[in-house]
């Protein structure tokens, strides 16, 4: 970090009066903080790393108080970095600011194959942390497992289901699947039935796998009760909204069966609960019926959830959720993004496959391409319908796809209220919470950016408009 960059960062912290996802502040006026392990771990475990700024006192409105001893501070911070597994190599920068010495320590991100980074004295389970906003929170067992399974190439769709037997699978469906595989892969014809079952992950050590139970099971939920879909229609924009008659859900359904059956039934539920309007096609002048949301986008979102959700023991008690609100459709898939994939890479980079057996089977059983076209299809379909861009959220324990309809539009009153709200600088997250909208990316595009373009909102870091520490204010 350059001296001028640290100087700007200090100004930003004082102006915004806040820490952030990548910024931590410690006074260090009376000595080196004794417990930096939580922050060292959480910063190392996120893709952007983080910066610890020493010499600002949060209890005094981030007043510059200076550090007690620059050399000793760097030495003791390094000692704490060396007690992490793997060890951390912090990069220090020192400047004088308003007559006192300020020191920053840049904590680099470690490669995903080395995560989680944890404090050796506490062990992996108790010493691993994740950054959430401006807080360092202990990693859940699932989050630790997610890293470990990726490193060890563990695929939960291939794990055997102890109570399952071949008699509980649909023999005709398996035979048809194998026949298709033989036609496409001639070498399979030379293998024994047992070899084919093992190579196609239908069985593992002669026991049916999770993938085969979900695709060929007579009744998969008899063995895996919560690997299903729950679908609801809410008469409002938030869970808990009710009709004038006190009805909480206009429609609800638990959807079970094989993946193919659940996909078909889920789409049928969606079709039953979305509005249809008649429009005039501008290209041919003919009247056409158009659904509230593009069916192809809904299908791809549900299909992605079925194939790419987490199927580990940590999430097998959680079903996929489809939630209709008056202004949007949400599809919740258990488990966060897998491997190196990030929100920004969706639809652009080739993903690491969490469930390769399911992905292979889906090419034949669900008529999917397995060419990573799902996300681009969702985006394209929403654009063709002149609807807002789909919103993708990667949370600690779930992945959420949100499709907005035409009811979700900004209006003048909201703009005026938002401008008033930003009399003091506000982050994207704070603005999203104020508007009661879950997705910051949607808020940025539909609310914040139009007001910035109109000169009604200004940036606290104008030279870095996409900074994660950006805040917005009005005159």
Where do the model's predicted regions map?
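N-terminal positioning helix adjacent to the helix-turn-helix/winged-helix DNA-binding module
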Residues: 354, 410-414, 443, 447
């Amino acid at each position: 970090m350059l001296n001028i960059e640290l100087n700007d960062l200090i100004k930003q912290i004082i102006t915004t009066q806040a820490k952030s996802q990548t910024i931590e502040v410690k006074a260090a006026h009376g000595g080196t903080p004794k417990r930096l392990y939580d922050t060292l771990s959480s910063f190392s475990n996120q893709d952007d790393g983080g910066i610890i700024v020493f010499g600002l006192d949060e209890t005094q409105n981030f007043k510059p108080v200076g550090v007690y001893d620059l050399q000793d501070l760097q030495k003791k911070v390094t000692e704490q970095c060396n007690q992490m597994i793997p060890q951390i190599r912090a990069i220090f920068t020192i400047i004088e600011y308003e007559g006192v010495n300020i020191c920053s320590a840049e904590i680099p991100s470690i490669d995903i194959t080395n995560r989680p980074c944890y404090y050796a004295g506490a062990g992996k389970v108790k010493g691993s942390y994740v950054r959430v906003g401006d807080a360092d929170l202990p990693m859940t067992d699932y989050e630790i497992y997610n890293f470990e399974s990726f490193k060890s190439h563990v695929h939960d769709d291939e794990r055997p289901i102890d109570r399952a037997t071949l008699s509980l699978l649909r023999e005709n469906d398996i035979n048809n699947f194998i026949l298709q595989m033989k036609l496409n892969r001639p070498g399979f014809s030379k293998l024994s039935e047992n070899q084919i079952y093992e190579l196609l992950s239908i069985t593992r050590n002669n026991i049916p796998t999770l993938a085969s139970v979900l695709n060929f099971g007579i009744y998969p939920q008899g063995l895996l009760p919560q690997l299903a879909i729950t679908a609801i229609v809410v008469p409002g924009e938030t869970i808990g909204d009710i009709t004038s008659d006190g009805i909480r859900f206009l429609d609800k359904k638990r959807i079970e069966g094989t993946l193919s059956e659940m996909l078909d039934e889920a789409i049928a539920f969606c079709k039953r609960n979305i509005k249809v309007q008649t429009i005039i096609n501008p290209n041919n002048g003919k009247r056409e019926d158009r659904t509230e949301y593009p069916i192809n986008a809904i299908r791809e979102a549900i299909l992605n959830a079925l194939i790419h959700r987490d199927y580990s023991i940590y999430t097998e008690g959680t079903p996929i959720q489809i939630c209709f609100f008056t202004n949007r459709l949400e599809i919740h898939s258990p488990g966060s993004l897998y491997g190196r994939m990030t929100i920004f890479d969706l639809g652009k980079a080739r993903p690491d496959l969490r469930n390769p057996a399911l992905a292979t089977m889906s090419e034949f059983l669900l008529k999917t391409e397995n060419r990573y076209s799902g996300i681009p299809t969702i985006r394209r379909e929403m654009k063709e319908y002149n609807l807002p861009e789909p919103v993708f959220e990667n949370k600690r324990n779930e992945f959420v796809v949100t499709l907005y309809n035409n009811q979700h539009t900004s209006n003048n009153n909201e703009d005026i209220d938002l401008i008033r709200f930003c009399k003091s600088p506000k982050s994207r997250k704070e603005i999203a919470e104020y508007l009661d909208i879950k997705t910051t990316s949607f808020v940025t595009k539909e609310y914040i950016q139009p007001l910035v373009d109109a000169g009604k909102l200004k940036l606290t870091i104008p030279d870095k408009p996409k900074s994660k520490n950006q805040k917005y204010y009005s005159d």
